[in-house]
Regions:
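Serine-hydrolase catalytic machinery in alpha/beta-hydrolase-like enzymes
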Residues: 5-105, 208-210
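Glycine-rich His-Gly loop
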Residues: 32-37, 117, 141, 171
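A short beta-to-alpha transition loop/helix N-cap that caps and shapes the active-site region
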Residues: 40-41, 71-74, 143-149, 176
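Alpha/beta-hydrolase-fold catalytic nucleophile elbow
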Residues: 66, 114-116, 137-140, 169, ...
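Primarily recognizes the serine-hydrolase "nucleophile elbow" in alpha/beta-hydrolase
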Residues: 95-161
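Short beta-strand/loop motif that positions the catalytic acidic residue
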Residues: 162, 168-170
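Conserved alpha/beta-hydrolase "acid-adjacent" motif
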Residues: 175-181
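C-terminal catalytic histidine-bearing segment of alpha/beta-hydrolase fold enzymes
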Residues: 190-241
């Protein structure tokens, strides 16, 4: 079960929810960049809580920073989205990394990052600003070709800074990112010489792993993606994986 930690980012207290495996460790770790529905509070989002527990059960200390700490949780999502800035998001992700890196149960040389939806974009962005990350997983991350606020260039334009292998998982019925967007992601990673693997699922829309959204959830695609994520993370974050 995840526990709440508090770190301070630019004078603002940010919740970081952390789930850990049983035992003494040290364990590999993951930063989970949250999806948009978690803006009401990680404790109120069943999908994010499930992810934290799922990865802890697989042997990872998993930390989800609450990137919307600048606003009251009851503030409308449109207000929060309009105020997000990439430079702040990078600081939030780096604060979560520092929290994990400072834990005795974490092997600081085996930390990865992943995210769904807007979290996929944030994970890509964060990887471009942290050369200690060892794995990046992007699940249907949209708007990677656009900046956020006045906080810097679009994540796609920073692809050459990604320090680690990348796994991407996308639905071919999604429009954000669309298949054409995913083509552009691939082109940017190829041009930058990044080690990446993308999988695309036919008959699959955005948010296909989110069981709390039955209109989008696709069990077959989700199950296949879980297995691909498991293998990828084991290969890059687990000795002998």
């Amino acid at each position: 079960m995840a526990e709440k930690h508090i770190v301070t980012v630019n004078g603002s207290d940010m919740e970081v929810w952390v789930a850990r495996p049983e035992g003494a460790g040290p364990f590999p770790a993951l930063i989970l960049a949250i999806h948009a529905p978690a803006n009401v509070g990680i404790e109120n989002d069943p999908f994010t809580l499930d992810l934290l527990d799922r990865y802890a059960a697989q042997g990872y200390v998993c930390a989800a920073p609450f990137i919307f700490h600048w606003w009251p949780k009851e503030e409308p999502m449109d207000t929060k989205r309009a105020g997000l800035r990439d430079d702040r998001l990078v600081k939030d992700m780096n604060a979560a990394f520092a929290l994990l890196d400072g834990m005795d149960v974490v092997d600081g040389d085996r930390i990865g990052i992943l995210g769904h939806c807007m979290g996929g974009r944030i994970a890509w962005l964060a990887a471009c600003h942290n050369d200690r990350l060892k794995a990046l997983v992007v699940l249907y991350g949209g708007r990677i070709k656009a900046g956020s606020g006045e906080g810097g260039p679009a994540p796609i334009d920073l692809a050459a800074n990604i320090p680690c292998p990348v796994l991407g998982l996308f639905g071919n019925d999604d429009q954000n990112p669309s298949p054409a967007d995913v083509d552009d992601y691939e082109a940017a990673l190829t041009a930058a010489g990044i080690d990446y693997t993308f999988h695309r699922y036919d008959g699959t829309n955005h948010a296909f792993q989110d069981f709390s959204r039955p209109e989008r959830y696709n069990a077959a695609s989700s199950d296949d993606a879980w297995e691909k994520i498991r293998v990828f993370l084991a290969r890059h974050l687990t000795p002998g994986g």
